[in-house]
A protein has these predicted regions:
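Extreme N-terminal, non-catalytic leader segments
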Residues: 1-41
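Hydrophobic anchor at the beta1->P-loop junction of P-loop NTPases
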Residues: 44
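The conserved Walker
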Residues: 48
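Conserved lysine of the Walker
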Residues: 52
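Conserved substrate/cofactor phosphate-moiety recognition/catalytic segment
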Residues: 57-105, 109
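Conserved beta-strand scaffold positions in the cores of enzyme catalytic domains, especially
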Residues: 72, 140-142, 186-188
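ATP-dependent NMP and nucleoside kinases share a basic, alpha-helical "lid"
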Residues: 81-88, 92, 104-165, 171
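Small-molecule kinase domains that catalyze NTP-dependent phosphoryl transfer to phosphate-bearing small molecules
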Residues: 146-149, 154-213
Length: 213
């Protein structure tokens, strides 16, 4: 699921003027070996209220209980800080994904499993997140939480679908903004019919398979 590439991070990307990439004196393989860990990013995508966060939380707990360092990057929480200056325009969504993808890549490089849960509705944005990891030779699993729109609307714990239908919330994915479903996700889970723990176990198996491939 990753192309053969260098261990270190990308250096071809846009960066601040006069700044060069600083190579660590500690190779990733050495860090992982000494810490007895392996890094990766699990990226959950799906409609709002599809069950992404519930599955992500279950996966995080499962991995940590098994002694695997993992951290859940919740899309809503990240907009309280890292992306607190962004709204929901197409450009802002793209920038949000870019920021989170870079954070996840750094976490994966350190030997953690970053579990990112974001609507991330556009193919090209998710492709960017994957490419960042593949360029750094890090595992990236795209998980599509496939839940019918009507089920998501029926859940609507924050009342966002109702507000969007009433025209009070613009650029809302699934109502006034499109969602581009993954065509070939690494893992497909069914948010309306699967228990979160079942979905989490499915992702865990795929992650183990990716590490040994």
């Amino acid at each position: 699921m990753v192309r053969q590439a260098r261990e270190t991070g990308p250096r071809e990307e846009p960066h601040s003027p006069g700044v060069t990439w600083h190579e660590s004196g500690l190779r990733r393989s050495r860090r992982w070996s000494r810490l007895r860990t392996r890094g990766a990013t699990v990226w959950l995508t799906g409609l709002p209220s599809s069950g992404k966060s519930t599955v992500a939380s279950a996966l995080e707990a499962m991995l940590v209980e098994d002694g695997i360092p993992a951290y859940f990057l919740d899309g809503d929480n990240l907009r309280h800080g890292l992306s607190g200056d962004l709204a929901f325009s197409t450009a802002d969504r793209t920038e949000n994904i870019r920021r989170v993808a870079h954070v996840a890549r750094l976490m994966a490089d350190s030997g953690m499993v970053a579990i990112a849960s974001l609507v991330s509705p556009a193919h090209h944005d998710r492709a960017l997140a994957r490419e960042l990891h593949e360029a750094a030779r890090l595992q990236f699993l795209e998980v599509y939480v496939d839940t019918p729109l009507e089920v998501c609307e029926a859940r609507d714990p924050k009342g966002l679908y109702a507000r969007a239908r009433a025209g009070k919330l613009l650029d809302f994915t699934g109502v006034s903004a499109p969602y581009e479903a993954p065509e070939q996700p690494d893992v497909l889970v069914h948010g309306a019919t699967e228990e979160p723990l079942v979905s989490a176990r499915k992702i865990r198996v795929a992650l183990e398979d990716a590490w040994v491939s």
